[in-house]
């Protein structure tokens, strides 16, 4: 999206400078209530900070991202402080996760690191309840999750 803004001559800013008027982003999944799973790229913390800091947020998706239930196509990414990995996995199991996997890097050995130097766990849950985002954040060692439930966003449908 940044490159498109540059091509169109739209000014960009950072949170260091001021509060952005708008944020444009994508999503991995969008349910009928505009709840999202984001974070396949591993930037959940930054994405949530931008949404909370911006005057208005637009999520641009195509129809392949629409799901009747979150978690239908993708697991929930969870950013985890590396030294808390075992503890976080145990706590997430208690929340009913059916599968938890450490995201591994492609093209090199070892895990994916977020831009903050943390690991990403991909978790599968059959039932994503409205307070799951808060329950995940309450686990010591969880930095952020890819669940975006109840955010003030506008979803725009891209067409060809």
Predicted regions and their residues:
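Conserved phosphate- and dinucleotide-binding cores of soluble alpha/beta proteins
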Residues: 6-160
């Amino acid at each position: 999206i940044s490159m498109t803004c540059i091509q169109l001559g739209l000014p960009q800013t950072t949170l260091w400078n001021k509060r952005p008027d708008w944020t444009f982003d994508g999503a991995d999944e969008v349910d009928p209530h505009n709840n999202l799973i984001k974070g396949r790229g591993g930037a959940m913390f930054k994405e949530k900070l931008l949404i909370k800091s911006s005057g208005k947020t637009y999520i641009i998706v195509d129809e392949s991202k629409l799901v009747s239930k979150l978690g239908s196509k993708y697991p929930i990414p969870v950013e985890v402080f590396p030294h808390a990995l075992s503890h976080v996995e145990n706590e997430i199991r208690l929340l009913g996760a059916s599968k938890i996997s450490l995201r591994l890097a492609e093209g090199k050995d070892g895990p994916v690191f977020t831009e903050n130097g943390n690991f990403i766990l991909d978790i599968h849950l059959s039932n994503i309840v409205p307070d799951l985002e808060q329950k995940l954040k309450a686990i010591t060692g969880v930095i952020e999750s890819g669940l975006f439930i109840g955010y003030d966003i506008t979803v725009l449908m891209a067409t060809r």
